[in-house]
Amino acid sequence: LRRQRQMCIRDSGNTTRNADDHCCGQTYIDLYNICPSDPNMIRNIKASIDMVVNTPQVNDWWWIDAVQMAMPIFAKFGKMTGEQKYYDKMWDMYYYTRSQHDETGMFNQKDGLWWRDQDFNPPYKEPNGEDCYWSRGNGWVYAALVRVLDEIPSDEKHRQDYVNDFLTMSKALKKCQREDGFWNVSLHDPTNFGGKETSGTALFVYGMAWGVRNGLLDRKEYLPILLKAWNAMVKDAVHPNGFLGYVQGTGKEPKDGQPVTYKSVPDFEDYGVGCFLLAGTEVYKLK
């Protein structure tokens, strides 16, 4: 949390629009909900998000990692305050990233997966000629949809839009799971640095387990998929001393942070462990 807080205040304080800086706000909101006697805990993040809400700009989430870092905060403030403006702004920003950024948007509805940013939109191709769908990047969006759906009311006007995207992604992810239970860093090109990768796999397990538990995904269809992935991570990625292997380091595409191995130490491992723990929290809740 200290590291996230340093990131949150490193640039422009309450005036930042950067999702990197907003991310820690999710944790502060959760802490505030546990101990609401200290409003200072959310003062800064609320001021920053209110600034974003009260401006017409919607193009801040130009890379898909940002969807996970910032989008759930709007859902949390909408739930906390009961004000529709947070839900409306969240949808406007999500829709721009999804469908309008760089003209086509970042979401390929045909394939059910996301390009990481405009650098990877067509005509960019993987070595095998397929579009480039980075595993962890898609995992970030998948997790963001879960965290948003967990917060917004059942009658929120765009809830079904989020559900539809979640279901579309789920079908696409099911098709590209590896035989060993993991997902490759490149979801459509197993030859491009193919191999086990934990962070993306963990995010997919997190989302699928949540979907099964909440009745959005068919239990018979998706439970075997997510359990195969979870058991593979526990068996193959977790070291006896707790170190987590097969975690890709920082980057934005399959080639970054290579090689990814059982013993490789990523340059920033926090999110690998965090994704794994998120997956565990949802698998644990399954009955």
Each PLM stretch: what is its role?
Residues 1-9:
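Single conserved hydrophobic/aromatic residue that forms the stacking wall/gate
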Residues 3, 30-47, 78-92, 149-168, ...:
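Structural helix-adjacent loops and short alpha-helical linkers that scaffold large soluble proteins
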Residues 6, 22-34, 66-73, 109-134, ...:
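Carbohydrate-binding/catalytic loop surfaces
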Residues 16-32, 63-79, 134-150, 197-213, ...:
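Well-ordered alpha-helical segments within folded domains of soluble proteins
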Residues 90-188:
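Active-site cradle of extracellular carbohydrate-active enzymes
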